């Protein structure tokens, strides 16, 4: 985003900016918040952020606060509330379905708050989020569920209706969100979050798998793209560093916002832009995420005014 605006307005290629290179060296030097070191990892030696959280659960725990995190219609959730609900859900998933380290749990629904809570819960208990395209039809769902080895599917009413058509082709357990229609084939979300928060620590290591996101596919089936906790967290810090560089170089205002940073979410959470660049990247800066059931211009304008939204993705 920054590159295209700057290249157009200032005819400056960031990759060739000596001031930027110097600042990167300063910001990533020993003792700094974004200190970088070379570490031997599976596949070779890589540069990593020394002070990055070790696993996604650390990211969530460090961001706990009473600031508003999610706004959906008339519902509001603080960072604390999201993490508390995720802890309850995580324990419910472990006890109800006897999940183990590395087991796959899929999410398929609209941009409901439950999407964010489920992501937090799954990655906090050492399991892997399979982020499913909510536009997929039944056969596409069947392929991804079987390809990923998913054990549990957390889905809303529309997605469960599609799953019901291919139920015999899979062996997954289903958790229903915001519907009572499918009680005969699904466990209710409400029952799972009725569990007490788990006191078990997350067993994930930095290079353990955290997510599987599917490509859109071209002439064949979509491909599952895996990411580890370390890869995701280092990406988040690299984006933070990039934003700080642009402030330092004068490309972005350095004025402190009067209101809490707030983003109107217009992209699906099943896409990396929604789940990573917006959702996960909102924890550390305590950014509020405002979403709608579906895109509506008048509602968006109303929310921008009411929530004092400063960005739109």
Task: Indicate residue ranges for each PLM-predicted region.
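Flexible, non-catalytic linker and terminal segments flanking ANL/adenylate-forming cores
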Residues: 2-52, 73
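ANL superfamily adenylate-forming
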Residues: 6, 39-41, 74, 158-207, ...
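Conserved AMP-binding/adenylate-forming core of the ANL superfamily
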Residues: 48, 54-57, 66-120, 137-142, ...
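Conserved AMP-binding A3 loop
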Residues: 78-80, 210-238
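Adenylate-forming
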Residues: 110, 155-164, 181-182, 267, ...
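Conserved AMP-binding/adenylation subdomain of ANL enzymes
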Residues: 233-263, 270-311
